[in-house]
């Protein structure tokens, strides 16, 4: 058995789940990207680093980096072309400590960031409120639709149940 080298990751994605609009989650296939695969895409495609530099930054060989990058790109292309959801999770990586997490204060709408390895803030640095939430990470962004998890048949049956209970009143 070959020991897989843990990749160094310096940034976590702000959101970990993407899906096509108006298709219930239960009706979708999911493409799974690991944290290190998304890091390879970030370094090469977003930051436009050369392959050598990106591989060095992740602590792996150029060949390994290229394999990770190609695998990640193939998964993203498959999801986009074939209407699949994309989930980003798991993998074998080491956090380099450069990762930052964003927080939101529900009281004053102030957004700030903290290093990943720091303890969670207890209050907003702007207004002192303790109504703070971590942004990203759970896949539920501002446009999250709560009822999007059920299939169309379930929606219809729940609607008819609701309508039936309204008529009885």
Swiss-Prot record:
It holds the Pfam family DUF134. InterPro entries: RNA_pol_sigma_r3/r4-like, UPF0251, WH-like_DNA-bd_sf. Belongs to the UPF0251 family. PANTHER family: PTHR37478, UPF0251 PROTEIN TK0562. This is UPF0251 protein MM_2090. It comes from Methanosarcina mazei (strain ATCC BAA-159 / DSM 3647 / Goe1 / Go1 / JCM 11833 / OCM 88). The lineage of its organism: Archaea, Methanobacteriati, Methanobacteriota, Stenosarchaea group, Methanomicrobia.
